[in-house]
């Protein structure tokens, strides 16, 4: 088993990256997959949403793991990896990661430190999902250099075109220089308010603008007050509000992501005949 590595990325904040990473990850685990989540955000948003409200008190986080790689020191198997009761493992993050980002600037192979760490764990999982911070800094570049695929959550409340252009330009650069296998799985519309026409207009605009280059997922994540409550609870939407529209949205996304993988495997098998 070698993990599919998926970065959840968008340099704009507040678009649902952490919520998507958590619920897609747990959605995959509910489908029998072995999943690891990676918090690559110094604020520790993913860590908090998985039930650790004080990430700064954790003794071993992604920062320490990357520090071991930088110093060329072995990492004891499983060191720092936490387990969530809904069936996913995760490597937490805290404010120390900001210092690590500064250290990376002068490091050798600075763009691939996260990849080197994930190489040490990838055989144990079917999927590794990376929650990126809202910037295009060195940590996000590390995530893109490590990932095989990217999902881009986009809030359906504003015109995202300019930010997307920057992100796609960075993805193109990483693909050319560091990670030729990198591909965009798709754009995921989040916080969709179906009571307004605006969300539909954004969806149509995205499909018209990027539809030829990039998939826009059929699954959409609706706007919901209940979804905002879950980050304080340390639970997924599947436990917090299992019959709600957000849980349905993430169930659909999970199926869509798994179907994409099947299509790719079939395509690869057909090519190798």
Task: Name every feature range the model reports, one short phrase each.
Residues 1-273:
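P-loop NTP-binding core
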